């Protein structure tokens, strides 16, 4: 049985242009350009690749074509989430939602191609989080988080 998401491939109008978002905002390493298929591969440094961008058809609309979002867990809790929030704003990204799910706290935002992404940090240990979910207690409460100061 599958146990985790190994990688995600997103369609991008121009993978070369969108690549800057993934390196500059998410801090990913650009590991390979597969020119034959107009793809760019990225890694967080522990795997050969975690995410790839592939050229979308010329007439493809922006946004979620067949999926909701991709979530990226962050280490460092709220302080790191605030830093990433600042980075998103500095990049000009659209932050859509700030949510407290009970077992995690999240910021949802769009990449340059309108794909919805999420940064989150867990607020409880995995076993407790599983019990929390199974009990139907996870939610979508507002999360009052401010971005880190511009100098952070």
Name each model feature, range by range.
Residues 131-137:
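Polybasic, low-complexity binding patches
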Residues 12-16, 71-116, 121-127, 138-152:
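Vicinal oxygen chelate
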Residues 3-7, 65-69:
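Short, solvent-exposed beta-strand edge segments and adjacent coil->beta transition regions
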Residues 10-51, 55:
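Core segments of cupin and vicinal oxygen chelate
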Residues 27-28, 58, 93-94:
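Short beta-turn/strand-loop junction motif enriched in small, turn-promoting residues
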Residues 54-58, 122:
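Acetyl-CoA-dependent GNAT
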Residues 38-40, 68, 105-107:
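Short beta-strand micro-motifs in enzyme catalytic cores
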Residues 60-63:
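Short glycine/serine/proline-enriched coil/turn segments at secondary-structure junctions
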């Amino acid at each position: 049985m599958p146990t985790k998401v190994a990688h995600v491939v997103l369609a991008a109008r121009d993978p070369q242009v969108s690549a800057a978002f993934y390196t500059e905002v998410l801090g990913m390493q650009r590991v390979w350009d597969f020119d034959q298929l107009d793809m760019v591969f990225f890694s967080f440094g522990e795997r050969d690749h975690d995410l790839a961008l592939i050229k979308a058809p010329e007439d493809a609309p922006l946004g979620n074509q067949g999926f909701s979002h991709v979530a990226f867990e962050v280490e460092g809790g709220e302080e790191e989430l605030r830093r990433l929030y600042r980075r998103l704003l500095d990049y000009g990204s659209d932050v859509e939602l700030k949510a407290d799910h009970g077992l995690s706290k999240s910021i949802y935002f769009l990449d340059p191609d309108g794909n919805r992404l999420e940064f989150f940090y867990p607020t409880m240990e995995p076993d407790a989080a599983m019990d929390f979910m199974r009990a139907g207690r996870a939610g979508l409460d507002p999360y009052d988080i401010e971005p880190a100061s511009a100098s952070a």
